[in-house]
Each structure stands twice: as C-alpha cells, then as structure tokens.
C-alpha cells in the first residue's frame, strides 16, 4: 500500500473510479501522476471505505474541482485489472443492463477490506453445511447397517437349513460379502468428521496421458479446427457417450503447446470430481480448478498462478471473471445447461454468451458442446453466426439406450402399479440387478413429499414468508420451505383442528424408501440437495451402490461404467411446466439422463413412466420429431419468443402488495409508451407462479424486443426508464432487470 496525503501539489491527476456499488456514474478522485488504468485504490465514498478500480486517468472533471477528494492509497499489493477485464465488464454492464460496479463486485467479490471477514463467514457456512451433510450421511449409514444386518440374518438362517453343498457354498460366499460390507459401514460410522477447511488437492502428474481419438472423433476434431480457424464459434453437437471430452482435451493440449491458456467451463464441477480427475490425467500440474465451493484463499491462489503461467482452467461460470491472458481456447461444455445463467445478484448474465464475448475480446477460439444444444445455439448455426460440427457415433456402443414408455394410467387400471413403480419397471430393475448392473432413478423433486394435508379439515401448511406449501422432509422430521428455508417441526397433527396430516406426492426421500422396500437386498443411495453429493457419486461410481435415486442432478455429465438402466418416475412434472421452453428442457433432461447408461459396450435401457404417453416430447425422443421441432420453432417465431427475439424481464418486489400492483401497472404503461408498439411487445404486469418469496410480493413485466439494429438503443431506453422510476418515486420496493431470462 502506498499512502501519500498532500503529495499531489505539483500535479493533479484526475481519475474516474469504478466502485463495487450500484452506481450509474463513476466518481472523480485525485490521484498521483503514476496511477494507471486498472490500478486498485482505496477511497472514502459516502462515509465508507472501498477499493475501487481506475477506469480513466487524466480526465477533465465535469464537476466542481473543489469537491473532488483525493484517494487514500494505491493498493500496490493488489494486481492491476487488465484492459481485457475492463472491456468484458463494460460489455456485460451494457448488455445485461446493470452497472459496471455490479460487474466489478461479481468479478472481485472479496475486496481487500472484507476478505478476512468473508473468509470467516464462508468457513462457518461450510462447517454448518458439512455438519448437516454428515448428519444425513450418518442417518443413511445407520439405515444401511440395519438392512445389511437383516439380510445377514436371513442368509445365516437359510444356511442353517441348507442341505445341498452348492447352496451352502453360495450362501457362505454371500455371508462373507455381507460381513465385509457391514464392517465397511461400521468403519464409516466410526470415522472422524472430515476437516471442512481442507480442500482436495490434485497430486502432481509428471506424465500426462495422451488422447487417442476414434475415426469419427478425428473427423469431428478436424472439422472443429477448420471452424475455429474461420473465426466463428463452433457448436459440437455430439450424442451422449460420443467422446466429446477427448476432443476437448486434444484441442486444449494443442493450445497449451502453442503457449496459450485454455478456459474449460462446466456447469457443476463442485459436485463431482470425475471431470477434474480426467483433465488432471491429461494435463497434470497444468490444470487449475476454480468454482464457488472453494475458499477465498484458494481462489486467490488460482488467480495468482494464472496471472503468470500457462494453464487449462476448469471452472464454473464465475471463472469468466479471472484475469485471462494469452487465451487461446474457450470450451463451454453442456452449453445448454441452465446453471450457466446467473439468477441473482446482478449481473444476471448468461455464461455461454459471455464466453463468446470473452473469446472475441481475446481473439480466442470458442467451442460449445452438447448432446442437446439450446435452440439459441442451433439457430445461430442456421443463421451462420456459428458453425456446427456433428458427432453422431457413440464411442463404446453404437446404439442409444432402448426407450420404453410406460402408461401409468393404463397400468393402474389393471393393478399394475406398486406405489410409484409399475410392475414392468420393477421387473426391469430386478433383471438389471441380477445381471450385475446398476440402476439410476430420476424424480425431479427432493424431500419426502412436496406437501402435507390435514385429512380432517383439508388445510395445507404453508410458509409464513412465501406463498408456497411446506415440503415434508422425513429424515429431519421437518416441514421446510424450499424458497426461503423457513422450517417447523413435523408433529403429524394439524395446527388448526388437530387432525392427522397426510403426505401427498412423492419426493426423492419417499422414492428411496419405496426402492428399499421393493429391493431389500440392494444397496440404495440418494443424490439431491439434501445429501452429500461427492460421497454418493463416489460410492455409485466404484460399485458400492446398486440403485441411485436422485433429482435432476443425476442427469448431469457423470460416467458410470455399470449403469445399464435409467428410469424416470412421475415424468409429467417435467413435461408439464408452464413455460415456452418446457418441451425443449424436457427433451434435454431426458436425453442427458438417457446418455448416462450403456456407456461401456452393452446397450442400456431407458424407461419413462408417464400418464401422457403421446406427448410430443416422447415423439422427439423416439427420433421421429424433426417436424415437431420445426413446429416448436414456428410457434416461437409466431409469438415472438427466442431465438427470434430478445426477452427482458422487469421484476418488481414489495412487502406491500397493493402498492406493488399500483407501481407495476404504472411501470408497464410507461414501458409501452416508450417502446414502438409495432415491433415491441410489453406483457403484464402479471404474478408469477410463486408470487411471494421472503415476505416480498412479486410482479413481472415481460418485454419482447426484435433483434434488429435498434436493439441496443431500446434496451438502453428500458434501463433509463427503470432508473428514473426508481429515483423519482418514494417507493421502498426494488426493481430487477433480467436480460435473456430462462
């Protein structure tokens, strides 16, 4: 740190500063002559101290010079923000209609003055989260121990009655296996809690493995190189299991060999180490990881290494903000994934599209990859903005998993259902387990049941802060709000009349319970937001678990050798969403899940249980849906939805619903008056499906904008109107602008 109060008498260098605040202007300060653009300096602003970034030097102030303050110090211990970073921030602020200060805060969330405090807070949260996961894991292990004890008792009883030597030998072997499993469970139960402050560190590998491609991969690889050489982003449309990762690795290795850095974006690397392990095998110490689960200290270490070295950086969307230099290649894996979109706080950016802009800033090639590309990326290929490369051949198995649609209404009529499982699916699971395979079951809701209802008066317990029902979590015996976290103990009795509360619907906890009852000899695990994801994935990957029940986390890019059957329960909840993207998302979810099985030679099986077997989504899954896909695009064109238009959502919140309705209506009228009604459409205000969260009522206004030369100007008009609306009224609510909402 360099301090210099009173040292600027000879030369007054007026600078403009970016502060980590929602400011629509950049304040002026006086600084020493040697301050450069991108330097970080400490200043006082509105009675508080901040670390800002110098955006301009030697400017002519448009205000009274006597009111301009001097900076407190130059933070010489903090690295200078590069010109490339500043360009990216400016683009994001303009495109996503936020302030550059909000982008700065996202890029450097732990400024010098708050890093220590933030590190303590995050460490505390990590400890609390680890304790909760530990309790869940202990509960699961105790239940598993009970099931193994029960199976062991049955086997020993059968052995005592057995007469044939062959039967005795088989039972003896099974007993030994169960005893080994029991000892392993007991060891886990007695093991000390892991050190939450300690993070996994990949061991050095001086001999990274070489990547060998199949003929189909070689062709795709060559086509990608041709496309990247042409200066356009490339979309690799490759079926699940086709070996896209191997192509990424080869391209990344070539970039490193040219002295370039590589950014490899993945939707959720914090959950599974599978991808990190594969990339570590390929790149050894040339691999850096960056994601939200890391401590601030680890993030700073990664950032420092990147500033001075050549690396492949594996990260989530936040890795876009790293101080990239000599960037040669950006890979966006699973580019369709919704987790690339930042929901809150600002900037509410789309990581995939921001990656394309980052590539343009650095002159780097951009490769998007997916087995189920987004409509936006497919449309960009049709219009010539992107180049598409297809990879239709699976690496180990030439065929997709066999699809079976089971009509649950028909099965229920003929008594073919046991709880939430059809007898047909039960038989498929038994067959798979008997052949030594594994099973994954998707249920797109966590908890035991999404709601409970009084059998006497019909009351459904709701969150006192949100307009939603409370979900029943049987393991913790609590009713929990999945929006704000509010919870109350579950007593089983109605608070109004004292009647019995009945669980309605089924979440992953209930499905797990049903699976354990149907297959008592199977080893069952659950993967959702309430379980220890890394531990569950590891045990399933190494074969210690037979059946995995999970939410949509199980559809992500895992690679399990023995997984040969995947099944979707209650699929109607996935295909019946009220959104213009509902069918697209359903197809992506199902195809991604389908691709998890049959990845090592044998053909897998994909079973969907639904009450709507003729839904267009299932026609698409059967491979005969090009006409349906074209129809979906025609509908979007007709009603003005992406990819043919741009959407902007204005989200208004207030604790007073009446006041909110009044101001939201006024806002909508002003927007409609300010935009050309012949080409722009203002819809609303309307209440979303969940119209109250954390004691705030919500209204939305949706704006459809044509993708023409006036798009930027119209978006600026929207931003200006919202700013004026916020500052010219005595309204205590707040407004959010969401560009390209999902």
What is each residue range found by the language model?
Residues 1-313, 319-367, 382-398, 674-677, ...:
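Accessory, non-ATPase domains that flank or precede helicase/AAA+ motor cores in DNA-metabolism machines
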Residues 9, 473-474, 691-696:
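Short, ordered beta-strand-loop transition motifs
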Residues 56-58, 108, 443-445, 528, ...:
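A general secondary-structure junction signal
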Residues 69-71, 406, 419-423, 666, ...:
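Short intrinsically disordered coil segments
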Residues 90-93, 426, 430, 512, ...:
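Generic solvent-exposed, charged/amphipathic alpha-helical segments
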Residues 208-222, 230-661, 700-701, 733:
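Inter-lobe coupling/hinge segments of SF2-like helicase ATPases
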Residues 438, 635-718:
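Long, largely alpha-helical accessory region at the distal end of helicase-like NTP-driven motors
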